Each structure stands twice: as structure tokens, then as C-alpha cells.
Amino acid sequence: IFSGGPSSVYNSEAPVPENKIFNMDLPLLGICYGHQLIVEEFGGKVKRANKEYGSSILTIDNDSDLLNGVGKSVRAWMSHGDEAEEIPSGFKIIGHTEGAKAAAIASDEKSVYGIQFHPEVVHTEQGTQILKNFVLKVCGAKQDWTMKGFIDTAVEKISKIEGNVLCGVSGGIDSTVVALLIDKAIGDRLKCVFVDNGLLRLNEEKEVEEMFKENFKVNFTSVNAGNQFLEKLKGVEDPEAKRKIVGEEFIHVFTKFAEKEGPFKWLAQGTLYPDIIESGVSKGPAAMIKSHHNVGGLPDWLNLEILEPLRELYKDEVREIAKILGVPEKLFMRHPFPGPGLSVRIIGEVTPTKLEISKVASKIVEDELMESGFYTKVWQAYAAVGDDKAVGVVGDERRYGNIVMIRVVDSIDAMTADWTRLPHEVLEKMSNRITNEIEDVTWVTYTISSKPPATIEPQ
């Protein structure tokens, strides 16, 4: 399977596989850039086209093994700027969208297929069926991989490592599952440390400590390093700089802890595959969208090896593991929270005022979602704040205050997301509470951009 990517096939530095792959009579599926690669390699032509991002209707034009059973039309997720102008000889068009006349092509005889859309994202209807058709029907593979099998394999691999493991836990499902897998494998050789970086949700440091002590029998301790992180972030506005500073400070905290409580040979992290893809360090030429504090390797001066048992999984798969490991539903259904914390939900410099606004406003958003029954139905929700201000009227007096942006999205794996259509009365209650309970806020807005083109977090 040739995946999508940011390159154009007519660029001199465009990534291509070894040419012999095209002459080995192997089933091939090209997705987005991979689709254009197949068109080019088999003698067709690719051209620069109008950019097409987001949802489109794919109309099925001809029968094929690839699109078998998907219906006459489906909603497909697009993210491209090139398209096939001429398809290769021996291929047929099996599907089109309004913006791409050859959105799906096939050579059933060669078992070679190209699709301009992304079947791997949840917003593409029947996307899983399309991938199943290729893997099972075209390639003849068997479905014998299970989450239970993954757990057994991971525990077996971890049990063979030597030395003690230091695991950074945040209270989120990713690092919690990592801690439980390692504990299952090596027991007392694991030490979990929670770092209060001053960028957490309201009362989170207390809630995380209680959660671990009440639910899990692992070695757990916490470190208060809030002042250290906030001091380093003073005057910093660039989002990438903030992310890198947070990542570096985590390493400094872990290093100091390891020197005092060690020896440790390993540092375990809850890195997932979307983190790796967005950081541009996956096995391929993915574009760097934003760095992640736990991705990219460790600095040379840190004498610890990295352990990332979940680095090839997505969030929905991690939640399945959590269920199998007996994690209470309340814990594994918590909304994802970024590693750099509120620093990436605060646009511009992290200041005490903006930090407090983000904490309190986000808590109000979560409370109202729980009250209305929407919390477990959405993927993620929070309130962001920047430097923009607007005039308001409070108690018949003019007030110049901050603008808060509410963000609520639906997703499965965080690779794509759609903004949630909340009832107006829920949004109204959020807005009223935020402006009434936070003196510095005068306006509340609701963000209605999907991913792509936006990202889930603002920075």
C-alpha cells in the first residue's frame, strides 16, 4: 500500500519505491499521493489541480474488487492538490467526485488500484470495507491480529528487558496503559512518576494522584515542577518553541528524578502513532505538522533508553487495551489532553491570567457536556484563549476583556476530526457561565473548523 503524503509526483525529490516493486506482480493500492504515483508509474499523467480538502461524495462508476459492497455512492475524505489527468492504459475509472474525475481507478487484471481519497480516516464511509476488500479479497490475507494478542506480545517483549523502568504518567489513557503493561511484565522494576508542570487542567494534579492510588497497584510518585516550566515559557510565543521547551523540561525533571531515585535504564512514554506521524518521524516522508513533546528520541546527554510499547497504535486501540486490562470506564473515556498541556491551548505567551482563564473555562465546558450527556459522545472538548480582546458590557459598564474559543470535536483516532454540532442551548449555557464566572472574559466563540484543514489543538 502506497500511502498519502505531502509530495507531488512530478517533483524531483518526490519519494518513490524501488522500481522492481512495479514488476513483481504484487497487488498494489495507492492512496492519495500513492494513487498519483501509480498513475505516473504505469504511464498516465498527473497534473496540478484545484485543492480539495474535506468531505466529498464519491460516485461509483464501475464494478471492481476494491469497491465491492460499498454501494453506489459514499462520502469520502479528500486532502490533495494534484489529480490524475490521464489514467494508464489497462486501467478503468471506478469512481469519481465533483473535483476529481478519476478519484478511483482499477486494473483488476493486474490487481493494481489507486484512490484519490483517504479510506483510512473515519470520515470516509465504507473506508474500512475498502481496505478489507484489498487486504482480504485482493491480497488473500487472513485476519488473525487481535488486541489480546498485542497485549500478550507486548508483555512478553517487555519482560525480557533488563534494568529498571521510569515511566512518565500524565493520568491520560496512553501513559496509564503503558504503565499497566510494564507493571504486568516486570512488576517492582517499574517506577511511575507524575510531573505537575503547572499547565494542567483544573485540580488535575490531585485527581491523577487519587486515581492511581485508588485503582492501580503500581509504584507511583509525583513531582511538583510547575514553577520550573512556567519560568522557561516566559516571553515565548511561538507554538513550536513552547512544545520543545515543555519536552526539554520534562527530560530535565526525569533526569533529576532518575539520579535521585535510580538507577534506571529505561524511560517509558505513552507515544502513539499519530504523534509520530504529525512529528514527521514516521517510517516515511510525512510532513511535520507539529512536534510532540514525547517524540523524536532522547537527547544524547540522557543516559536512558526509550520504551514506547504503544507507538504503532491509535487512541481507539489503546482504549480497547484499557478495557481488557480492567481500567474503569470513567478513566479510559477521559478526553485526550496534550502533553504540552495548556501551553498549546493558550495562543501566544503563557501568562498567569490566560492560564487561569483556560483552566476555568475548560472546566465549565467539560461540566456542561457532562450535565447534558454529551461528554462521552464527543472526542475532545476544551476552551482556548489568546491575546485578542473585545469590548463587552457588564453591569452597565464597558469592559475590555479576553475572547475565549470553545473547541469540541468528534473523532476516532485523532488523525481527522469534525466539529461537534452541539445544541444551541448547551453552547448558550457554556457561554453564559464563562462570561459570568470569569471576570476577564467578554466574548465566547465556537470553533467550527474540521481537521483538516485545522488541527484539534490550536498550537
Pin down the residues of each PLM region.
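Structural motif
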Residues: 1-3, 62, 268
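Glycine-rich phosphate-binding loop
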Residues: 264-274
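Helix-terminus/capping and membrane-interface signal
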Residues: 29-35
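Glycine-rich, N-terminal phosphate-binding loop of Rossmann-like dinucleotide-binding domains
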Residues: 3-5, 169, 271
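Active-site beta-alpha loop architecture of Rossmann-like, nucleotide-cofactor-dependent enzymes
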Residues: 7-8, 274
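RNA-binding accessory domains that recognize and position tRNA/RNA substrates
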Residues: 8-12, 16-17, 22-24, 36, ...
